């Protein structure tokens, strides 16, 4: 039986603690993008949503800095590995990974 790799598209949104410095927040964003690339993903779109008010306190924080990354990969383990990486990162207070359709990928303004 042959196993074919399927190209899939994903979106990840994550929130970091507001107590981090601007430099630390940007570094965290770069680390997540680099992790995706190292695991065989290709970044298609990225966006810094900035500081946002939370609907309810999370770890006693009322706001957090949000980031969005859309990527594609043939590595079926990448979403789970990214989920685990975000889970163990103490600076990340919330995250969400989900599969999207190719037509839902936003275009970076070049």
Swiss-Prot record:
The question of whether RNA-binding is a record keyword is answered with yes
Write one Gene Ontology MF term.
small ribosomal subunit rRNA binding
InterPro entries per UniProt: Ribosomal_bS6 (IPR000529), Ribosomal_bS6_sf (IPR035980), Ribosomal_S6_plastid/chlpt (IPR020814), Transl_elong_EF1B/ribsomal_bS6 (IPR014717)
An example of a Gene Ontology BP annotation on this entry? translation
Q: Key word rRNA-binding present in the record?
A: yes
Q: How is this protein annotated for GO cellular component?
A: cytoplasm; ribonucleoprotein complex; ribosome
> Pfam families given for it?
Ribosomal_S6 (PF01250)
| Keywords for the protein's UniProt record, in alphabetical order | Ribonucleoprotein, Ribosomal protein, RNA-binding, rRNA-binding
Alphabetized CDD domains for the sequence: bS6
* Described function: Binds together with bS18 to 16S ribosomal RNA.
Q: Which HAMAP family match?
A: Ribosomal_bS6
Q: Which family does it belong to?
A: Belongs to the bacterial ribosomal protein bS6 family.
Query: Would you tell me the protein name for this molecule?
Result: Small ribosomal subunit protein bS6
Gene name on record?
rpsF
